[in-house]
Swiss-Prot record:
Position of sequence motif HxxHH motif: 160-164
Segments crossing the lipid bilayer: 24-44, 80-100, 129-149, 158-178, 183-203, 217-237, 257-277
List of glycosylated residues: 297
Keywords per UniProt: Endoplasmic reticulum, Fatty acid biosynthesis, Fatty acid metabolism, Glycoprotein, Lipid biosynthesis, Lipid metabolism, Membrane, Transferase, Transmembrane, Transmembrane helix
Gene, per the UniProt record: ELO1
Species, as recorded: Trypanosoma brucei brucei (strain 927/4 GUTat10.1)
Name of the protein described by the UniProt record: Fatty acid elongase 1
Annotated knockout phenotype: Genetic disruption in bloodstream form parasites reduces fatty acid synthesis from C4- to C12-CoA primers, whereas synthesis from C14- and C16-CoA is less affected. RNAi-mediated knockdown in tsetse fly procyclic form parasites results in reduced fatty acid synthesis.
Family of this protein: Belongs to the ELO family.
Ranges where the record places region Disordered: 284-305
PANTHER family: ELONGATION OF FATTY ACIDS PROTEIN, FATTY ACID ACYL TRANSFERASE-RELATED
Gene Ontology process terms (BP): fatty acid elongation; fatty acid elongation, monounsaturated fatty acid; fatty acid elongation, polyunsaturated fatty acid; fatty acid elongation, saturated fatty acid; long-chain fatty acid biosynthetic process; sphingolipid biosynthetic process; very long-chain fatty acid biosynthetic process
Reaction(s) catalysed (UniProt annotation): an acyl-CoA + malonyl-CoA + H(+) = a 3-oxoacyl-CoA + CO2 + CoA
Length: 305
């Protein structure tokens, strides 16, 4: 890592990923409760918000937005702090996990970097800390959805909540079973989120017209992440089950889940990219209804319109 504050160094040194794993295994029902509560909020939250402000959903949406469509001043400032915090968090994770992946690729080749499972690297040391925190961070990232509701979203996009809940369940399962290929997931996701959440923070600060041209490129990077994820997963499964396979430090069930997850993301993100940037819908007339889709971890263009 380029710089590690002393307090963070102590957290890394004291991290006991094996104990965290054992707790997650013993309390696997917790992630199910969180997921069910989250899904309940997805479908009830917008309607509840409309009732709390004492009006219909359409009027609530209009009242929740400022003139530039990014939300009330309090919501907007909170979004800046939240997204900036997630970006900084992701930068720290990237600076720790990604160099290890690159070093493994250089020293061990693609097979070694993907299939050589080291328990110490996965559960202990500073790398293990950022792998574990990555898995657990999928819980607080659900707060993204709260901000969409506070901005007056009447219906949360499928890609938004599907992405959040599936990656949460997958990350919990992966940290419980251990996976040599998970370093790819963490390194890529940390890297993409470093840029994506910084984009959201700048947009909420009022610079959306400046950063908006970057939106399609960030989405392209997200799609490339899914392509690489599919390839890594298929490679691991081939080494595990294929004729002449050398074995791989992964769980077969976890890899099947990972493949379904990445393949579905690839389809959904690609479909969204085409709809947003290749065949975008006509913009509403001035003074007409807002076209904000508010897709966190989805179309960055739509989130900040």
């Amino acid at each position: 890592m380029f710089f590690t504050p002393p307090q963070l160094q102590k957290l890394e040194q004291d991290w006991n990923g094996l104990a965290v794993r054992d707790w997650m295994i013993a309390n696997v029902d917790v992630v199910l409760y969180i997921s069910f509560l989250y899904l309940g909020f997805v479908f009830i939250g917008p309607k509840l918000f409309a009732k709390l402000v004492g009006t219909n959903p359409a009027a609530a949406a209009a009242g929740a937005r400022s003139a530039d469509g990014t939300g009330s001043p309090i919501v907007r400032r909170s979004m800046v702090v939240w997204n900036l915090a997630l970006s900084i968090f992701s930068i720290f994770g990237t600076s720790t996990v990604t160099p290890v992946l690159l070093r493994n690729l250089a020293n061990k080749g693609f097979y070694g970097a993907t299939c050589d499972f080291k328990e110490t690297e996965f559960y202990t040391t500073n790398v293990g800390f950022w792998m574990g925190i990555f898995a657990l961070s999928k819980i607080p990232e659900l707060v993204d959805t709260i901000f969409l509701v506070l901005q007056g979203k009447q219906e949360l996009p499928f890609l938004h909540w599907y992405h959040h809940v599936t990656v949460l369940l997958f990350s919990w399962h992966t940290y419980c079973v251990g996976s040599s290929a998970y370093i790819w997931v963490a390194a890529m996701n940390y890297s993409v989120h470093s840029v994506m959440y910084l984009y959201f923070a700048l947009a909420a600060l009022g610079y959306k017209r400046v950063v908006r041209p970057l939106a399609p490129y960030i989405t392209i990077i997200q799609i490339l992440q899914m392509v690489v994820g599919c390839y890594v997963t298929i490679f691991a499964l081939q080494e595990l089950h294929g004729e002449g396979g050398r074995g791989c430090g992964v769980s077969p069930a976890n890899m099947r889940i990972q493949l379904v997850m990445y393949a579905s993301y690839l389809y959904l993100f690609s479909k969204m990219f085409v709809a947003s940037y290749i065949r975008p819908p006509k913009r509403p007339t001035v003074g007409g209804p807002s076209s904000t889709a508010g897709v966190s971890n989805g179309s960055v263009e739509k989130k900040v319109k």
